[in-house]
Amino acid sequence: MKIELVTHKTGEQIPMMLDASGMPVVLPNEFILARRSLSTNTLVRNLRELSVLYRWLDKSNCDLSAKLLAQNSFNEAELKGGLVEALRVDQSNGRISAVAPNTFNQRLTTTRQFISWCMDVLISQLPLSSLDYERLRERKSFLLKTLDGSFMSATPMRKSLRKGLNEAEIDFLLEVLHPEAEQGFGRDSAVKLRNYVSVGLMLFCGLRPGELLSLRVEDIQFGAISAIKVERRPADPLDVRRPRPQIKRNGRVIPIENKQLVFTLNEYIVTWREVLESKSQDESDYLILSDEGCLCRNPQLHSFFSCCDRNMLIIFLTT
C-alpha cells in the first residue's frame, strides 16, 4: 500500500491510498473524504494506520466488504488473533518489533472508526424490507465490542518538567541574535533581521512554528497598539511547501508589547524583506522568507533553532 498526497486546484491537499498496482483503494479513500475537515497530517496518519489493516486483508486474501456482508463474517479469533496482532507489529526499516502502546491504540481507534463507517455504509444500502438489517446491526455491535476489548493500557511516560527560557536566557538569546551584534550569525543583514524578527514573534507573541510561517505581511498591524493577526485561511494553491505550515489553534489578534520588536519588524518589512525576496523569481505575501527568498519551510526553521542552540553554547563558553 502506498499513500499519495494529491493537491487540488483550490490548494486543498487530500491523501489517497493506492494498491500495489497503483490504483486507488475505494473504501479507505471514501472514508478519508468524509473526514476532510481534519488536517492533512491527520488524514495521512489515518491512511497509514488503515494501510496496516489492508496489508492484513491482502495477506488473508480477504475482501472487506464481502466479508462484512457474508453469513460467516469475522469471528473473535480472526479479529483478536489476526487483525489485532497485525496492528501491534512495526515492520519499518526491515525489522519486526512491537509498536508502542499509544501507537497501537491509535491504529486500533482508526480501524474501529473505519469498520464502523463501513458497516453504516453497507446498512444504508439495504432496502427497507431487507431481512439483513438486524443481522448487520448485530454484527456491527459484535465487531466494535470485540475491538473495544483490545485496547492496551499505555505505559506511564516519564514526564520531565518542561522549562521555558527565563528572563536572563531570553535577553542573552536576543542579544546574540541582534542584527548589530558582533557575535551574531547570518549571512547578511537581511537574514540577521529575519532571524531576530522570527524569534521575537515566537517569544513575545507565543507563536508556534506553523503560525509563524503562515503569517503574511498584511497580518502585521502597526499603530498605537501594534498587533499581529493569526488567521486560519483556506489552502493557498501558490504555497508549494510540503508539508505546509498549519495553524492548529483558533485565529486571534495578539498585541506586540515589545517596542524594540515593533521597530525591528517595521524595518524588516519596509527594507530587508524585499532584499530577501529579490533573490527569488517568485513573489510572495508571506512574512518569513528563506535565505534564498523563497517560502521558509518547517525543516529550515528547525535547522535555524539547532544552529542557535550550538552557537549560543559556544558563545556562552567563550565569554
Describe the residue ranges of each PLM region.
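Short, charged phosphate-coordinating catalytic segments
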Residues: 121-125, 202-227
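DNA breakage-rejoining catalytic core of tyrosine-based enzymes
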Residues: 142-178, 239-259, 280-282
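Basic, Lys/Arg- and aromatic-enriched nucleic-acid-binding interface segment
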Residues: 168, 175-209
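Conserved tyrosine-mediated DNA breakage-rejoining catalytic core shared by Y-recombinases
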Residues: 214-264
